[in-house]
């Protein structure tokens, strides 16, 4: 066991904010980010859009200081990470369209792009269907072995499962619980979805300015991504399995999931 994880297991998570944290690259695969919002101004390093052009999934770079959001979902998610982890460098990958959906192929293309870029933490506040399970397993496992942490949301309404990639062992799956984000969270025993974080009544940045209140697994997930960014900022050599161990050791005991 490395000295980093031994220290990380002892330090209260809230104390990490008092440290000189290294910058950590955090990708947000979502509806885009409104980088003109005061809460997110200067936080987005690069921005992309993933679309289907002539039958091919195409990844296009866009200006990182503009409104790249389609519906406001990604802006909300990004603001949670930005608030929790001041050391997070945000990378915006827009995969959702104006109808808040995307094809499994576009989502898979976004995940492949994120893992190929080598971003340390990848937040996925969305879920794919099961048709591409084999492809997603291969991509997520490769990222895991490269030391990348993929944090993914459980489906708010499960349809035959918890959703991909959240239920894959190479990811950290997150469900919605009745906790005070971000430093209180639970561990779900006997489930592929490992953590339960506070995602109810969360005040987030609204696209176009101002703030709004949201609820859902989508907003519990970035709380865990933010904590991973804090841990990696303090202990850059931590591996995904060590992040899982640290988070489990700090989780409240029991299946404290909100009904």
Residue map of PLM features:
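Gly/Ser-rich catalytic serine loop of serine hydrolases
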Residues: 66-75, 157-158, 212-224
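Active-site/binding-pocket entry motifs
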Residues: 34, 50-51, 96, 180, ...
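Extracellular S/T/G-rich loop segment that most often corresponds to the catalytic His/Ser-adjacent loop
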Residues: 163-233, 237
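A cross-family glycoside hydrolase active-site/sugar-binding cleft signature
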Residues: 94, 123-127, 151-155, 176, ...
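C-terminal subdomain of the subtilisin-like protease fold in secreted/lumenal serine endopeptidases
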Residues: 1-13, 115, 119-124, 233-259
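Subtilisin-like peptidase catalytic core
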Residues: 60-130, 234-235, 247-251
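Active-site core segment of subtilase-fold serine proteases
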Residues: 2-84, 88
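Mature extracellular/periplasmic domains of secretome proteins
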Residues: 15-21, 101-123, 133-148, 159-175, ...
């Amino acid at each position: 066991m490395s000295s980093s994880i031994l220290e990380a297991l002892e330090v209260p998570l809230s104390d990490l904010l008092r440290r000189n944290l290294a910058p950590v690259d955090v990708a947000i695969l979502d509806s885009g980010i409104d980088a003109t919002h005061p809460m997110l101004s200067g936080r987005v390093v690069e921005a992309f859009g993933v679309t289907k052009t002539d039958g091919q999934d195409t990844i296009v770079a866009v200006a990182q200081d503009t409104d790249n959001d389609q519906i406001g979902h990604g802006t909300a998610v990004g603001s949670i990470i930005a608030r929790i982890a001041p050391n997070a460098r945000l990378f915006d990958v827009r995969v959702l369209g104006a109808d808040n959906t995307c094809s499994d192929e576009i989502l898979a293309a976004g995940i492949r792009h994120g893992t190929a870029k080598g971003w340390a933490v990848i937040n996925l506040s969305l879920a794919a269907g099961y048709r591409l399970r084999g492809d997603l397993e291969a991509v997520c496992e490769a990222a895991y072995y490269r030391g990348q942490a993929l944090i993914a949301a459980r489906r708010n309404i499960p349809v035959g499962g918890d959703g991909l990639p959240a239920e894959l062992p190479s990811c950290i799956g997150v469900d919605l619980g009745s906790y005070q984000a971000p430093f209180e969270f639970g561990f779900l025993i006997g489930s592929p979805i490992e953590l339960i974080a506070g995602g109810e009544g969360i005040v987030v940045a609204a696209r176009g300015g101002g703030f709004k209140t949201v609820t859902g697994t989508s907003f519990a997930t970035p709380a865990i991504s933010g904590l991973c960014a804090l841990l990696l900022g303090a202990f850059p050599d931590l591996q995904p399995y060590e992040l899982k161990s640290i988070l489990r050791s700090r989780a409240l005991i029991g299946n404290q999931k909100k009904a």
